[in-house]
Amino acid sequence: MTWNATLALDYTRQAGKTVAHFRHSGPLRILQSLYPEGDAICHNVIVHPPGGLVGGDTLDLQFSASAGAHGLITTPGATRFYRSTGEPALQRTHLTLEAGARMEWLPLEAICYSGCLAENHLTMTLAPGAELIGWDITALGLPAASLPFAHGSFCQHIEVPGVWLERARIQASDTLLMSSPLGMAGHRCVASLFFVAGSKLDRHRRQQALDTARQIIEAHPLSATAGATSPDGQVVVVRVLAPVVEPAMALLRQVWLAWRSHFWQQAASSPRIWSM
């Protein structure tokens, strides 16, 4: 039996408060809206009761924010891509921001179990004046549990249409990619954090985003396998390779909190669900 599910969540600004409205079909839900930072920022948690995807499953997620709205979206646990008998498992996410909107897209990691055929697509469309901070974290197998990513494949697609496009296909059988110093060098966690603007960042702001990230990276144990770049005037990216998820997640959280403080004047405030 396969699961197909859709979830659409729209953030609007009403009398100084960001309000979330959602629609769903199948096993996808949004938990109660939370306001730990005040009415201006709405925190939401995506829940997928089946707990993972197998071959043939499809999840479609659509999130939007209107002018002046600020939404933060996360998950209570990892997205799990389990073994497939032939059909791929697909997750598609589309984030759409109107002018003046802000969004933080912070799901916990996706875990690719051995034998999976997984695809994870993320598309971000921003109007001029909109800004987004998000990340994408993928674990290949569970090395700490002696469950390696021995066979299977994972396809990743991250795009800001007309601005930035990254595609990757990771096959467990590709020993050069998985083990070569020019590839993943034996690491099993691949992670990216991105700051995306709907129009070009001015030079000072863009450089400050890079400098802030690089200072944090230099002081972190993963400094040899992490870096910050700006592939386009609207995008700044931090990339990390790590043996397991936890150190990569810790590094990205530090940069995320620094960026939201420097550029949005928002105090450090991690989603409560992460501490449960």
Curated annotation (Swiss-Prot):
It is found in: Cytoplasm. Its main location: cytoplasm. One of its GO terms (cellular component) is cytoplasm. It comes from the Bacteria. Pfam families: UreD (PF01774). Keywords: Chaperone, Cytoplasm, Nickel insertion. InterPro entries: UreD. One of its GO terms (molecular function) is nickel cation binding. The keyword Magnesium does not apply. Belongs to the UreD family. UreD, UreF and UreG form a complex that acts as a GTP-hydrolysis-dependent molecular chaperone, activating the urease apoprotein by helping to assemble the nickel containing metallocenter of UreC. The UreE protein probably delivers the nickel. HAMAP family: UreD (MF_01384). PANTHER family: UREASE ACCESSORY PROTEIN D (PTHR33643:SF1). Required for maturation of urease via the functional incorporation of the urease nickel metallocenter. This is Urease accessory protein UreD. The lineage of its organism: Bacteria, Pseudomonadati, Pseudomonadota, Betaproteobacteria, Burkholderiales.
